[in-house]
């Protein structure tokens, strides 16, 4: 596996802090802001870590609230809204400096 692929996959390695709390420590790669697709994917990973592995993503809605900064840790807070027989619902908020940057 080449370094670019390893670095890209490393973006999705979140650290579990608590049952519904994850973090990611970034490092500057020369961009001013974090790419929105990265935050979306990381939120998806955080939410997926809180559901049964047999569950698949059915729907994903998101809001970009503020620009993300590579030099700041991101906290992913998962809200377990519903665990039903057919569907599981999660809300994931990405937070930097105490403010939501993505939901």
Short names for language-model regions:
Residues 1-103:
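Terminal targeting signals and extreme-terminal segments of soluble enzymes
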């Amino acid at each position: 596996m080449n370094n670019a692929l390893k670095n890209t996959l490393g973006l999705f390695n979140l650290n579990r802090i608590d049952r519904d709390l994850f973090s990611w420590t970034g490092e500057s790669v020369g961009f001013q802001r974090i790419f929105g697709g990265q935050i979306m994917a990381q939120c998806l990973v955080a939410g997926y870590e809180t559901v049964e592995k047999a569950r698949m993503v059915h729907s994903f809605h998101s809001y970009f609230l503020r620009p993300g900064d590579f030099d700041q840790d991101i906290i992913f807070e998962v809200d377990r809204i519903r665990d039903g027989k057919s569907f599981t619902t999660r809300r994931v908020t990405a937070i930097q400096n105490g403010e939501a940057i993505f939901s």
